[in-house]
């Protein structure tokens, strides 16, 4: 029944997510560094977090219209730009940030690095919650700040969770490792790689803990518009006044609309003194000025047409997730995909295969000829996992899973 229903949905979709896009000649990262990263340029890449779907035409049309003008001098931010973004956030997440709280940043990882340099001295510390997006560790370390680890607790699959394994925050351990040198906590919300939409109670508790201790929470919310299966994203700064006053939120349309190469990120800082300190630094270094195409792409995305595309894309993503879960259950039951609540990234629990780290990587890379992110790069708790990007046409996923099935059964 599920297959029939999904086929029916595909037939009535306006947009074609089954279309194969040839990315050769575009210098795309997903294919371009396979030899350097994996030692094989001919792998099927399902690793870096951009989509293999065509960027929607209403965005490319807006960019072409500006290109037709043929003069690309200095530009200013379009009128009502921040009002437009604030309205989108309010419509989707029931929280409206004030326009004066917002500014452009040249990428979220860059924004994290900038915030670290502004607010954390070199002898101070940054807390992260592994397994988590690896730049949360690399960026503080690269800026000569000590990283403090507050590992998430795995919560096994239960009926109460709809059969979904997940993670929870360990507040007891957080209290143990947090000392007076801890100045910042980097939060992944929704969580990457496990796709968790953190609930308001958890975020409120985290906000209270950090606010009491003068810790700034940097909340990476880049996957916020990709909540799945009826789940909802909760902006960290929305859960309490304490959360608002101790937080820096980063967001962008790049994941949702597949425009990562057009850097359209933004920051939201409700606290007046924090905002003055951070935004003055950004302005002094001219890091709050977007390139000419960023506002154009964002304004084209955050429209009723963009909302229609987003909803269809999420339907397709949900179908891909169901397909991966069903395929593994029926063909490779030792691999247990965690059903994400948000994003197009699926956390594959491969521990039942009984392989060590190198054997697991070799199974995917050398035998199945697939490029995924291995779990160890996400830190403690990621051992035995692989991160799969399922934002691809169904035929591509089928090919990948068939390769994996054949490789495992012929091990």
Outline where the language-model segments fall.
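N-terminal small-domain helix-loop-helix segment of the aminotransferase-like
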Residues: 14-107, 114, 302-304, 411
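Conserved core segment of the aminotransferase class I/II
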Residues: 241-318, 325, 408
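Conserved glycine-rich beta-strand-loop-beta hairpin in the small C-terminal domain of fold type I
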Residues: 299, 316-325, 337-350
């Amino acid at each position: 029944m599920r297959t029939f229903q999904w086929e029916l949905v595909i037939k009535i979709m306006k947009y074609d997510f089954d279309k194969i896009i040839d990315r050769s000649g575009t210098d795309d990262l997903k294919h371009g560094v396979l030899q350097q990263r994996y030692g094989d340029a001919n792998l099927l890449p399902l690793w870096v977090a951009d989509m293999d779907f065509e960027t929607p035409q209403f965005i490319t049309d807006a960019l072409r219209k500006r290109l037709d003008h043929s003069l690309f001098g200095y530009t200013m931010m379009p009128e009502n730009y921040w009002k437009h973004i604030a309205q989108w956030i309010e419509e989707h997440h029931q929280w409206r940030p004030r326009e004066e709280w917002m500014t452009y940043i040249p990428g979220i990882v860059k924004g994290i690095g900038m915030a670290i340099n502004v607010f954390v001295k070199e002898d101070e510390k940054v807390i992260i919650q592994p397994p988590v997006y690896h730049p949360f560790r690399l960026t503080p370390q690269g800026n000569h700040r000590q990283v403090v680890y507050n590992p998430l607790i795995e919560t096994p699959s239960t009926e109460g969770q709809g059969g979904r394994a997940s993670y929870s925050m360990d507040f007891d351990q957080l209290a143990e490792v947090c000392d007076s040198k801890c100045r910042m906590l980097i939060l992944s919300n929704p969580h990457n790689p496990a796709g968790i939409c953190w609930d308001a109670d958890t975020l409120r508790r985290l906000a209270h803990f950090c606010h009491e201790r003068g810790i700034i929470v940097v909340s990476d919310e880049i996957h916020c518009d990709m909540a799945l299966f009826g789940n909802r994203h909760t902006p960290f700064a929305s859960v309490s006044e304490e959360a608002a006053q101790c937080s820096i939120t980063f967001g962008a349309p790049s994941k949702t609309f597949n425009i990562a190469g057009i850097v359209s990120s933004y920051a939201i800082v409700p606290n007046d003194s924090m905002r003055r300190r951070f935004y003055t630094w950004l302005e002094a270094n001219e890091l709050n000025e977007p390139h000419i195409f960023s506002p154009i792409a964002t304004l084209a995305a955050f429209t009723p047409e963009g909302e229609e595309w987003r909803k269809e894309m999420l339907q397709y993503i949900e179908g891909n997730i169901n397909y991966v879960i069903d395929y593994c259950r029926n063909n490779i039951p030792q691999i247990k995909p965690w059903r994400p609540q948000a994003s197009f990234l699926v956390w594959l629990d491969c521990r039942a295969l009984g392989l060590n780290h190198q054997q697991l990587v070799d199974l995917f890379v050398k035998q199945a000829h697939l490029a995924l992110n291995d779990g160890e790069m996400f830190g403690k708790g990621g051992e035995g996992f692989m991160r799969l990007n399922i934002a691809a046409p169904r035929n591509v996923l089928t090919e990948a899973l068939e390769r994996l099935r054949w490789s495992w059964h012929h091990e």
